[in-house]
C-alpha cells in the first residue's frame, strides 16, 4: 500500500481535475474533501459557512481530511485546508503533499469559467481577481511549507499528471500503465 497523495493549492489550480486524472494514471482511489464534506452534511460549502461560520467549516474540513485519508488514495483538498496547523502537519506526516502552483491570472480565468463558482462563498467580499491575489499572497507560503513537491499547474492536465508522477519517489509510482504517453 502506498501513502495518500494530497493535492493542495488555491481555488482554480486544478486539484479535482488533476486528482481524478492522477488517480486513474496510478490506479489509486480518488477523494475530494469538499465533495465528501458536502455529501455527508447535505449542504454546500457556502451553506455550512453561513450556518456554522468559517470556524465550523474548518473543523468539518479536518474531519473530512481524516475520513478520506487512506493508502493509495489521491486526495483533492479544499484551498484553505492548509490554514489549520494540524492539517498541514497531518498531511505532511501521513502522505505526500503536492502543491499545484499557478499564477493569479490562470486561477481567475479558471474560476470565471467554472459553473460551480457561485456555490463557493467569497473569502473577502472583493472582486474575484483581487480576492484571488490577496488569498494567494496569504496562503502561498503555507502551501510551499506543507508540500513535498511543487508542480506548475498551468499546463494541460495530462502534462501536470506526468510531471507529478516523474517527481514522486519510485516506491510511489506504482502505475497500472503509462496512460499519458
Swiss-Prot record:
One of the protein's GO biological processes: chorismate biosynthetic process
The reaction(s) this protein catalyses: shikimate + ATP = 3-phosphoshikimate + ADP + H(+)
Subcellular location: Cytoplasm
Gene Ontology CC annotations of this record: cytosol
Pathway per the UniProt entry: Metabolic intermediate biosynthesis; chorismate biosynthesis; chorismate from D-erythrose 4-phosphate and phosphoenolpyruvate: step 5/7
A family per Pfam: SKI
Alphabetical list of InterPro entries matching this protein: P-loop_NTPase, Shikimate/glucono_kinase, Shikimate_kinase/TSH1, Shikimate_kinase_2, Shikimate_kinase_CS
Cleaved signal peptide residues: none
Residues noted as binding ATP in the record, renumbered to the chain: 12-17, 120
UniProt cofactor note: Binds 1 Mg(2+) ion per subunit.
Region (LID domain): 112-126
Family, per entry: Belongs to the shikimate kinase family. AroL subfamily.
PANTHER family: SHIKIMATE KINASE, SHIKIMATE KINASE 2
Subunit details: Monomer.
HAMAP family registered for this protein in UniProt: Shikimate_kinase (MF_00109), Shikimate_kinase_2 (MF_01269)
Function, as annotated: Catalyzes the specific phosphorylation of the 3-hydroxyl group of shikimic acid using ATP as a cosubstrate.
Name the record gives this protein: Shikimate kinase 2
UniProt gene name: aroL
Amino acid at each position: 500500500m502506498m501513502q495518500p497523495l494530497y493535492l493542495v493549492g488555491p481555488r482554480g489550480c486544478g486539484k479535482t481535475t488533476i486528482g481524478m486524472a492522477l488517480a486513474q494514471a496510478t490506479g489509486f482511489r480518488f477523494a475530494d474533501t469538499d465533495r465528501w464534506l458536502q455529501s455527508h452534511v447535505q449542504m454546500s460549502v457556502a451553506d455550512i459557512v453561513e450556518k456554522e461560520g468559517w470556524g465550523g467549516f474548518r473543523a468539518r474540513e479536518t474531519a473530512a481530511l481524516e475520513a478520506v485519508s487512506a493508502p493509495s488514495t489521491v486526495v483533492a483538498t479544499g484551498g484553505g485546508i492548509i490554514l489549520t496547523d494540524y492539517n498541514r502537519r497531518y498531511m505532511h506526516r501521513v502522505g505526500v503533499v503536492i502543491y499545484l502552483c499557478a499564477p493569479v491570472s490562470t486561477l481567475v480565468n479558471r474560476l470565471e469559467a467554472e459553473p460551480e463558482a457561485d456555490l463557493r462563498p467569497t473569502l473577502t467580499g472583493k472582486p474575484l481577481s483581487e480576492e484571488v491575489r490577496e488569498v494567494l499572497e496569504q496562503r502561498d507560503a503555507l502551501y510551499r511549507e506543507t508540500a513535498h513537491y511543487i508542480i506548475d499547474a498551468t499546463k494541460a492536465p495530462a502534462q501536470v499528471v506526468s510531471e507529478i508522477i516523474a517527481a514522486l519517489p519510485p516506491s510511489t509510482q506504482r502505475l497500472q500503465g503509462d496512460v499519458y504517453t
